[in-house]
Amino acid sequence: MYKRQEIDSEIVRLYKERMDISKHVAEYKITTGKKVFDKTREDEKLEKLSSLADDEFLKHGIVELFEQIMSTSRKKQYQLMTEHGIVEKENFTEVDSLDFSNARIVFQGVEGAYSQLAMKTYFGENCNGYNVDSWKDAMEDIKCGKADYAVLPIENSSAGIVSENYDLLVEYDNYIVGEQIIRIDHSLMGLPGAKISDIRTVYSHPQALMQCSDFFDEHKDINQVAVRNTAFSAKKVKDDGDITQAGIASHISADIYGLQVLESRIQNNKNNATRFIIVSAKRVCRRDADRISICFETPHKSGALYHMLAHFIYNGINMLNIQSRPISDKAWEYRFFVDFEGRFTDTAVQNALRGIREEAIALKILGTY
């Protein structure tokens, strides 16, 4: 027992000595302008160190141990660089408040869509909004300057992420500048005089249908048909004039299209909510913004994601959300999206972003809000 304690104490002493060397390495790299992370050099070191072991178990253990030591050493060097004033500016213009005067806002869907409700909640009832057919159209409109802001659903508390909009954040150089959470209460609506027993087909957005699966389990004779928007389903029921059709949308849609609510709040989760993001083509943020969204690609190897997330852990940063999406041109490889608390001026955030930027294949700042 004593021998083990003695060895552990010696390991701690040597580890402290190893970290002291990191300071000198950082000073050298600051002077020469070299990057902290040199993958080729580290791989060579790991191969040389593992060759000192005489069995595979020890080889793996040595690689794991020294990967961690090197990772911690890099984090120390990132911190020292920040302390020396070497900071990567993110080039977001800070403002006291976003400029909504004469702003044109675009949302996907038709009159009565939840996106329209989110828009009016965030920008005000009398905001200058208009609709397009698809989320991609909305992103295109702010890219070309036709609109100043777009309102896009990004995540539902029951059905999960809106994957297409995560992909659009990567495809376009547009930025998240705000968010709005809207309570989602789905109503089943049909033509005036219709009853649930008349209904044979229900239309709605795929996520809305998913969120109301319990209702369909109780009405197995009803066919589900996906359409591009919840409010569009209400418009379709009105336009088709077929008493056997119903739509799932907000009660506001029923009022707009003159439909009758057959049953209210049919979603599985009575606390159902959707988070919408406000997107702009400008790299702008409110001065009090305290949430940052990023995405990054990692090397396709064991432990790569852990090493990226370790930058948040070591710097005491609270992650709020993490999602993954497949990379379209790389089979079985993924891009990761992370929301976390903090500001670009925070030392901890600067350290974490420096580490991820150096060690990831790619990093994109999606916005701060």
Task: Specify the residue positions occupied by each region the protein language model found.
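Domain-level signature for soluble enzymes in the chorismate/prephenate branch of the shikimate pathway
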Residues: 3-369
